[in-house]
């Protein structure tokens, strides 16, 4: 794995990377948490692009990902992925969350992007336990980078120090 994912504490909407990942809801029309923050920072162009995707493709199912323009964000594009709602772990949540990361990475690579920033998908209002979600994120991203690595920079952007510490500890256990 040539690229070692980085952990940063901060605001994903301010990052100068090729693509940021939005922890979206199926409608793609904005909501709370990081989804709302991205929509507010990106302005009306992002909402219009999401409405167009919704009109053409319908809602985005959990585990899937779609790409749009970034509007007023410094990033070039936004990949919207829908993570699972936590129901105790017995409804394929782990696989759906892994798919959200994997499909986002594949979409970034398919569009020739070199840098990507992820929030902690599903750990806000969707209630996924932070530790378990981080384990899935780190495992999925590092496996992708080991097998297929068109990316030069991968960031895990954490909203709080507790989450950042979890990611740092998990990444330290990977070569």
UniProtKB/Swiss-Prot annotation:
InterPro entries reported for this sequence: Macro_dom, Macro_dom-like, O-Ac-ADP-ribose_deAcase
Protein's name in the database: O-acetyl-ADP-ribose deacetylase
UniProt family annotation: Belongs to the MacroD-type family. YmdB subfamily.
Enzyme Commission code: 3.1.1.106
Record keyword DNA damage present: no
Active site annotation, chain numbering: 35
Taxonomic superkingdom: Bacteria
SUBUNIT field: Homodimer. Interacts with RNase III.
Function: Deacetylates O-acetyl-ADP ribose to yield ADP-ribose and free acetate. Down-regulates ribonuclease 3 (RNase III) activity. Acts by interacting directly with the region of the ribonuclease that is required for dimerization/activation.
List of residues binding substrate: 11-12, 25, 33-35, 122-126
GO biological process terms held by the UniProt record: purine nucleoside metabolic process
Residues in Macro domain copies: 1-175
Alphabetical UniProt keywords: Hydrolase
NCBIfam families linked to this entry: PRK00431.1-1, PRK00431.1-6
Catalysed conversion reaction: 3''-O-acetyl-ADP-D-ribose + H2O = ADP-D-ribose + acetate + H(+); 2''-O-acetyl-ADP-D-ribose + H2O = ADP-D-ribose + acetate + H(+)
A Gene Ontology molecular function term of the record: purine nucleoside binding
